[in-house]
Amino acid sequence: MADVSNRVHLNPTTAQLVEIALLRGEGQLTANGALVAKTGERTGRSPNDRFIVKEANTEADIEWGKVNRPFDAGKFDALWGRVEAYLADKELFTSELEVGADDEHYIPVRVTTEFAWHQLFARNLFIAPETFNRGNKDTWQIINAPGFVCEPQRDGTNSEAAVILNFAERKVLLAGLKYAGEMKKSMFSVQNFLLPAKGVLPMHCSANVGHDGDTTLFFGLSGTGKTTLSADPKRFLIGDDEHGWAPGGVFNIEGGCYAKCIDLSQKNEPVIWDAIRFGTVLENVVLDEQRVPDYKDTSLTENSRAAYPLEHIAQRKEDNRGAEPHAVVFLTCDVSGVLPPVSVLSKEQAAYHFLSGYTAKVGSTEMGSTSAIQSTFSTCFGAPFFPRPAGVYAELLMKRIESFGSQVYLVNTGWTGGPHGVGKRFDIPTTRAIVDAIVSGELKDVETVYIDKLNLNVPVSVSGVDTALLNPVNTWADKAEYDKYAQQLAQEFSDNFAKYKVSEAIKNAGPNV
């Protein structure tokens, strides 16, 4: 973007941005040194206001529909021009950042924001390189103008706000909304489109590495435990949300973390707790009279967040990279209480459950979501962010698993002993013990028992886990009731999977109806 203002702060520091944000009344300083900001009525993503410009070069490769809504190229250019005109007399903030911790696969991006705290968020979540765009690649542009109000009839938008991706012009436009997560997810969507063409699998997952260099991936929707479980004091964090898996290794797409704060505690999540300090942005977190964050207060939203750079984590992989993963964990939050806490998956089962993406919306990141918990199927454990047809990503996953020999596990962080409201949720220490067993290799050749209805193989024992919890039928007081719920869940899987055109081997890898 050309200099649309003679008051542009180029590559501002954290201290400068915090200072300016406070002076402008954009947020408050908390007792732990973080900057807290509120986003108004939009406290999550706005999927109905997200568009991709329809143009000849990419039109045939995008799966158009409710997730990827088409936008007219002419309308985009007109709207971009209006937003630039709106920003012309404003004090702005611009940083030269990168998306992708990989020399070959990074995207250079110039981020311009109206708000200082949005710029701090971008600098925390993207990568601030020592030398910008060392490979002289074509640079993307992000403009974020929350004060601009779209007019649907004039602009072609769905409401007063819009998030629009334009692959032909390498532009992302955010207008009329304050929720900062839209910035990071927009560039994730861009990488999700571009990477598969290079043979790289983009993933909605977290990743960490052990002292021996063994990498583990954690796939899952918001609230299933990606950030919590990957922030392991015994291992080194690569990243908490977005990664690429190329032949030879895994790399973080980001340079920071965007952790959910609901019920955050120092005891259960010490790594995240310690990362929240000066330089961190707290989004929609309520403060008490002493400016101490109250992470239990959900009066603003269930989707309160902390955005901090990876440098805030002591135990991290400094190059944001790792070897190919020995273990791949699919995190599912089962509200029916039917699935076991851990299952060992075959390659075909891995493909089936990756495409299914069964889980629950727990403190959903979407605008308007309430505390009501409901089951959902989200393809590739991140349907809102993948522009290409699902099969493209599933095929890449199978290719990577087969070529490296990764073992895939399905881990239920949801309920047992009954559905939500009757049973109880697996506690974090139990899930951590399961993950410890996975990363140690204990479960790779473990003895298993077969659960016919679910078509899953379950370990007969896991170190540190009560054996009675491993087979879910044993945790239900009423076995007939369990069978009823299991049958219902199997049918839901089957109904959802009917839309996929895959091999019989993959089709038959799901629950038995």
UniProtKB/Swiss-Prot annotation:
SUPFAM superfamilies membership: PEP carboxykinase N-terminal domain, PEP carboxykinase-like
Pfam family, one: PEPCK_ATP
Enzyme class: lyase
Annotated residues for binding of substrate: R45, Y179, K185, R305
Positions with a binding annotation for Mn(2+): K185, H204, D241
GO molecular-function terms, A-Z: ATP binding; metal ion binding; phosphoenolpyruvate carboxykinase (ATP) activity
GO cellular component, one term: cytosol
Recorded metabolic or biological pathway in which this protein acts: Carbohydrate biosynthesis; gluconeogenesis
NCBIfam families assigned to the protein according to its UniProt record, in alphabetical order: pckA (TIGR00224), PRK09344.1-2 (NF006820), PRK09344.1-3 (NF006821), PRK09344.1-5 (NF006823)
Family: Belongs to the phosphoenolpyruvate carboxykinase (ATP) family.
PANTHER family in the record: PHOSPHOENOLPYRUVATE CARBOXYKINASE (ATP), PHOSPHOENOLPYRUVATE CARBOXYKINASE ATP
Annotated protein name in UniProt: Phosphoenolpyruvate carboxykinase (ATP)
Lineage: Bacteria, Pseudomonadati, Pseudomonadota, Gammaproteobacteria, Alteromonadales
